[in-house]
Structures are given as structure tokens and as C-alpha cells.
């Protein structure tokens, strides 16, 4: 019998500085948004609004919006969840299946419901207190992925709720919603001594390898773009940026990208330190090829899951 969720690891052996470069890139660039823009529309449960919003913010949404991973990572798309639930004598609890899930196209603000796996019925979120006919508990809330711009256009698309109530409750809380992009990394990634390791969760209802490919393709593209945009100051070293003096052959390392790339070509550098190094040894295109080969190796290793 296949389990709905399994914990696995993907391990590839790489040159240590390249493994560190990929790990740091993953942790800094692969940002899956949390549901931190939450609005409680009605609540007669025993849990206060803050408890509901905290629980909803950290719903593991990647396993629900798995068909849209690349566009969510590029922020072309966002998402929202909506819950309207009343306690009954028969149903005294709430699972993740009780939510409705919607993808948001940020160009058009269109809101489209997505299918939800029946396995979400196994993930409990809340248990109501003992049912009483005259005091049935209810909860209605909506939460948007971080970075979603709430405006009249997108609110007009929320045809499944009372817009007047939404506007009132949103105006009550919008000043305390964190304006920064709030996110988590999809996986834990480590790279001790070049052993690049991804600790992943695999679910039975979708193709994890396809999702991983979307993530790695995004990461590779973002890293290559960063490499092309990266610059090292040439001239006197002033200890504010990574810089290289061709006359003395001294390199001052002040950022992780410079450190990892020069170490790949034989330097033994550390952050905020000077090193005598011949920068003509650095071949950016060779490093990019090694990066692309490493990404292929990661995807190949995932085929063994």
C-alpha cells in the first residue's frame, strides 16, 4: 500500500564550493509564499482570530498548488484559501479538505478554483468543542499568499463571499499585515563537504519529480542570471565590495557568490578577507556549465525515489 506522504532525501556529490553555491542559492532564491494576508470574516469558535490566522498561514500549500510551482516562484501567480464552516452534530472538526483553494493570475487578477486531493481529509486543522444546537460554532476566513495586492479588481472577483463584510474586516487588519514578502523554503538543503542533500516530502497524489524539475529549472535560471549580473570591482580594494587589484594580485572577498566561484577555481577564500589569487583562472562559462550539469545530476538522482 502506498503511503500518502513519505520523507526522502536526494543526495548528489559535487565539488564543495559548487554544492555550497547551489545550497545558498536555493535558500535565498526559492521562496514559497506563506498565507500571511489573512482576514477572519466571522468567528464564533472558541479559538481567537489570531490562532486561526497562524494555523492557516503555514498550511503546506505546495502539495495543493503543485501544477503552478514555476509561476508561483516567479510571482506571476499567487493563491488564496477560503473556509466557511459550521459545526454540526455529525461533523465536529475541520480538515484541510474543508477549504477551497484558488490560484490568482497577477496580470488579470482572475481567481480560479483548483482541485483538491481527497487525502487532505486526513489533515486535521481544528476540533470544535462539544456540539450544542443553540450555540453552534462557525468560522469563515480567507487568506492570500504573501505579495498579493488587495485592490478593488481582485475583491470584485471574490464572488463566493460577502464583499461588504470583507472590505470592513480587511480595513480593520490591513495595517498590521506584514508588507514584506513572507516565505519558506520548499525543502531543507545542506551541503557538507560537497554532499548536496535535499530533504523532501513526496505525496502519493502528484508527480513529485515533475515538481522538483520546475523548482530546479527556476533555481538554475535565477542563479545564471545572478552570475551574469554580478560584478567585482577592479582597482584598489576598499573593503566595501568584492574587489580585485590586478597589479598586486590581491582579491578582497565580500560576498558569497564571489567566494564560491573563486573557490571553484582553486582559491581558498573566506568572506571579508584578502587573498592572493590570479583572477584569469576564473572561467564564468565553465562554472555555468558545471552548475547546469549539477542541476541535471539532481534531477537524475530524484528518479531513484
From Swiss-Prot:
Subcellular location: Virion
Catalytic activity: RNA(n) + a ribonucleoside 5'-triphosphate = RNA(n+1) + diphosphate
GO biological process: viral transcription
Record field: transmembrane: none
Pfam families: Pox_RNA_pol_35
Keywords: DNA-directed RNA polymerase, Nucleotidyltransferase, Phosphoprotein, Transcription, Transferase, Virion
One Gene Ontology term of the molecular function aspect: DNA-directed RNA polymerase activity
Domain of life: Viruses
GO cellular component, one term: DNA-directed RNA polymerase complex
InterPro entries linked to this entry: DNA-dir_RNA_pol_35kDa_poxviral
EC number(s) reported in the record: 2.7.7.6
Self-association and partners: The DNA-dependent RNA polymerase used for intermediate and late genes expression consists of eight subunits 147 kDa, 133 kDa, 35 kDa, 30 kDa, 22 kDa, 19 kDa, 18 kDa and 7 kDa totalling more than 500 kDa in mass. The same holoenzyme, with the addition of the transcription-specificity factor RAP94, is used for early gene expression.
Family statement drawn from the similarity comment of this UniProt entry: Belongs to the poxviridae DNA-directed RNA polymerase 35 kDa subunit family.
Protein role: Part of the DNA-dependent RNA polymerase which catalyzes the transcription of viral DNA into RNA using the four ribonucleoside triphosphates as substrates. Responsible for the transcription of early, intermediate and late genes. DNA-dependent RNA polymerase associates with the early transcription factor (ETF), itself composed of D6 and A7, thereby allowing the early genes transcription. Late transcription, and probably also intermediate transcription, require newly synthesized RNA polymerase.
Protein name per UniProt: DNA-directed RNA polymerase 35 kDa subunit
